[in-house]
Amino acid sequence: MARRIIELDETWSAIEYTLRVFEEVAFEDGARPTAEVFSKATAIVYVACTQKPPNNLSADIYYRFSQHTNELAKRRKNQYGISRYARCATTLLNYLNRFYVKRLKLPEIENVVNAAFDAAAAADA
């Protein structure tokens, strides 16, 4: 039985929803995502990152995450919560971090978050 191909829009929709929940947790002390939501999102990341080329979405997810984080840093001037958000995002994108990022020697997910907030803070200064 062939595995279903997961498209970028479906993948990013699940990731973005979970990242928004993490944003509320980190910056507004919101409710944590349910285990079902979190496990579904991590499973989608895993499947999307292990699909055979040209359907492998690792590069697209990394790029979109970087863009999402830059936008988040511009919206959230408050530095409180950055480390919590970075930990949550790293956990969600663990598979991407462990294989794609390491193989291409890219900045790790936590470093992407910190760099985005540092750049936003420098732009405001």
Regions inferred by a protein language model and the residue ranges of each:
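Eukaryotic scaffold/interaction segments
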Residues: 1-125
